[in-house]
A protein has these predicted regions:
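Interhelical loop/hinge segments that connect adjacent transmembrane helices in multipass membrane
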Residues: 1-4, 174-184, 196-241, 284-301, ...
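N-terminal membrane topogenesis motif
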Residues: 1-24, 45, 76, 200, ...
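Signature of the first transmembrane helix
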Residues: 3-63, 93-101, 128, 225-255, ...
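Membrane-interface junctions at transmembrane-helix termini in multi-pass inner-membrane proteins
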Residues: 5, 131-155, 349-380, 391, ...
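Helix-loop junctions and terminal segments of transmembrane helices
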Residues: 27, 57-73, 144, 263, ...
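Interfacial segments at transmembrane-helix termini and the short loops linking adjacent helices
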Residues: 104-125, 321-352, 459-464
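Hydrophobic alpha-helical transmembrane segments
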Residues: 154-169, 173-204, 379-384, 390, ...
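Membrane-proximal transmembrane or re-entrant/amphipathic helices at the cytosolic face
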Residues: 449-506
Length: 506
């Protein structure tokens, strides 16, 4: 087995372990031992730090990979490349610090009325941002060395475990106060960055010794233009996922941010299939679009297959979440409070479904000569999201933040996919997707009939009965949906997976 395969397997295992830790932490520790306001505080601090670090990074991660062939040689310092990966983000962080203190008054005024707790702890976002920044830098360096498993383990397992310990020390064992919890957050990310650095140094394959011999005027110009593009892309790309959290914190308070954060975590499950499949399919789309002439037919066929499969997988996950959402909140610690985010779950899950079904389109644009236009569409997305969040949250509350996200994405994908169809000639739509949506409606209809029948037979069910009924109902709805997909020949890939599964059972 090659090094890439081994590293991929180890990284995947680390990711799934991290998901399990994150699930337990979010749904059984945070909701039980922290108030919604405290959950909101930890969420906004990390969101702010992530945003700050993305800007300070100045595109170093992508630039390192792009310009690595120019520096590559047999030396440990790759002719000064690793040195620049330390210096450029540090300069970016200094620039960010100047901007932060210049606009500190605006930040305080925006949050002081409804989220004074965030104002009290906003300075802690700075060290967290610094540590997250260099975690990203060291991970990029490890990627060059083709050693991604340990950095992935540090990010997915160590960081999540450290945060879990902090939450338990604060909420369950009462060893530390809120100040101590925030310091544990800082220390956890700091140790994560330090462990990444130690791993690189102990590998004895890297050196941060400076070397200016490869910095030509042409390289400097190319690097500056590419970095400018990446900074702008990072700005819009990092702002978008955190906009609603910031607006809700500023206009409603951290308690509502905590409720929104839990709802968003539930909705994020719809995206899980997209994350893995998107990384696999991108090289194949790139090959189709980079041939001379581009194989538009192959790219379109692949695009439609991926969109259909993603729509099917995401829709099934969304339905299974939604038909059990009331029971989930009843089982969740302090679920009566977090149930206020029920409709946020549905709205955000639909927006995640749109991303899973059509997100490949934006990525495929990167492999054409119109790659730079993706930045323009992303800017439109962010501006729409800012305007809609500002307008809808005061009217609709946390649901307004979810509606703002969904509406922004719908408009964004209409514009983006229209442009891709016009310029590239590919599109994700096929009649099979109408079958997928019809199957989803049938599954929801079947669930409704079962709930109606059970409700007539049992008027005041116990919690144990509700759990058993939910398990049985979920199995029935899933099996019926799977049979319709199989015999309706909706997706050859899904049918092949089903046949493989049946052969394994036999």
């Amino acid at each position: 087995m090659g090094i890439i395969a081994r590293q991929t397997i180890k990284g995947t295992i680390a990711t799934y372990i991290g998901v399990a830790i994150g699930f337990v932490t979010t749904f059984f520790i945070l909701t039980k031992y922290l108030t919604a306001e405290e959950v909101g505080l930890t969420r906004v601090l990390v969101d702010a730090a992530t945003l700050f670090s993305s800007l300070a990074l100045m595109g170093t991660g992508s630039s390192t990979l792009r310009f690595y062939p120019h520096f590559k040689d047999d030396s440990r310092n790759q002719q000064g490349l690793y040195f620049w990966t330390l210096i450029i983000p540090f300069v970016g962080f200094l620039i960010f610090l100047i901007c932060f203190f210049a606009f500190k008054g605006l930040i305080v005024r925006a949050f002081q009325d409804n989220s004074p707790l965030f104002v009290n702890y906003v300075y802690y976002a700075l060290p967290i941002a610094f540590f997250v920044l260099y975690m990203s830098v060291f991970e990029a360096n490890a990627t060059i060395l083709e050693r991604v498993a340990v950095p992935r383990m540090i990010r997915e397992v160590f960081i999540r475990t450290g945060l879990l310990v902090g939450y338990l020390l604060y909420g369950l064992w009462h060893v530390i106060d809120l100040d101590g919890l925030v310091m544990v957050l800082c220390a956890t990310y700091g140790l994560g960055a330090l462990l990444n650095l130690c791993y690189l140094l102990f590998s004895q394959k890297i050196s941060f010794k400076p070397d200016f011999s490869k910095i030509t005027p042409e390289l400097r110009r190319d690097f500056l233009w590419y970095t400018l593009f990446l900074i702008t892309a990072a700005l819009v790309g990092s702002v978008m996922p955190t906009l609603s959290s910031f607006f809700i914190s500023a206009k409603m308070g951290l308690m509502f941010t905590g409720i929104y954060a839990i709802a968003n975590y539930i909705a994020t499950m719809v995206e899980i299939p997209f994350r893995s499949l998107n990384a696999i399919v991108q090289p194949r789309i790139a090959v189709a679009l980079r041939t001379s002439p581009p194989d538009i037919s192959a790219a379109t066929r692949l695009y439609q297959q991926v969109s259909t499969n993603q729509l099917l997988a995401g829709m099934v996950i969304l339905i299974l979440i939604w038909i059990n959402i009331d029971l989930f909140f009843d089982l969740l610690p302090n679920g009566e409070q977090y149930a206020a985010g029920k409709w946020v779950v549905l709205i955000l899950a639909i927006s995640k479904l749109a991303t899973t079904a059509f997100g490949v389109g934006g990525s495929s644009l990167s492999y054409t000569r119109w790659y730079y236009t993706s930045l323009f569409f992303t800017l439109i997305l962010v501006v729409l999201s800012i305007c809609l969040n500002n307008y809808l949250i005061p009217i609709c509350g946390i649901e307004g933040g979810a509606w703002a996200t969904l509406a922004s994405l719908v408009i964004y994908y209409i514009l983006l996919l229209s442009f891709v169809w016009w310029r590239v000639g590919t599109h994700p739509f096929s009649w099979v997707q109408l079958k997928v949506l019809a199957i989803g409606l049938l599954m929801l209809g079947l669930n409704y009939l079962i709930v109606l029948a059970v409700g007539k037979l049992v008027h005041e069910p116990s919690m144990l009965f509700r759990i058993c009924e939910a398990i049985a109902r979920t199995l029935i709805v899933s099996v019926v949906g799977l049979l319709i997909v199989y015999y309706g020949k909706v997706s050859p890939h899904v049918n092949e997976l089903i046949r493989k599964g049946l052969r394994m059972v036999k």
